[in-house]
Amino acid sequence: GEEMGEALFQQEYFCSFQGAVLGAYYAKQMLQARRENRITQVPWAAGVEVYTFWDLGVDDSMTIWFIQVVGHQYRVIDYYENSGMGLAHYAKVLKEKPYVYGDHYMPHDAAVREMSSGENAKSRAEVAEDLGVRPVQIVQRARNMDAVMAGIEASRNVLSQCWFDETKCSKGIAALEGYRAEYDDDKKILSNRPLHDHCSHGADAFRTFAVGYAEKTKGSSWSKLARSLPKNAMAV
């Protein structure tokens, strides 16, 4: 199709990483961000709260985006991922950063009580709050593939308002650029479901942001800071 042709063209003539990922969901949006110089050095605005957006992977991996709302812009200032660590580790990571936090957005599975902990089982969200990561806002998990695709569309929509710190968010940016549809080898077509790989967690945590915060606050809390800015100028 047209998108595949464009991807192959980018790959062949520009050695473009974005183009080389066939079926990448956010290729167009991330390429636009690069062209508009929105993947750059993004300073932390000290007087503005930092919101965090999480993905709690089933394979014990954890990803966190750190985002500020400044004017009409989402400033994606930091990113962290790890695996095999307990929540205390992530609470420590957050505390060691200089940020003043707003809410922490976690997917719905964070609200599920841990079965292994006996009668006094606490959910991961409750454990996080006990560790000082609070308040936690629970974001509904996509229940089916339609909801996943709606979340991908929400992420595409919000990417045009995002500025990424290219150093602190390098792994997260790579995850967004590499997040792609499964390729059906038998039929030689892209399937309608995302490939689960190393890019999934960063992309899922970003979807927590797009669905749990950006869509819900459009025209409300974020507009209190809104000011008119040209697309390629960062708010001060």
What are the functions of these language-model segments?
Residues 9-13, 64, 104, 176, ...:
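A residue-level signal for conserved active-site and pocket-lining positions in enzyme catalytic cores
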Residues 1-56:
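ATPase catalytic-site recognition across NTP-hydrolyzing enzymes
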Residues 25, 63-66:
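A short secondary-structure junction signal
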Residues 20, 65-195, 216-220, 224-228, ...:
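Mg2+-dependent endonuclease catalytic cores in nucleic-acid-processing enzymes, primarily RNase H-like
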Residues 196-217:
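Acidic, Mg2+-coordinating catalytic module of metal-dependent nucleases/exonucleases
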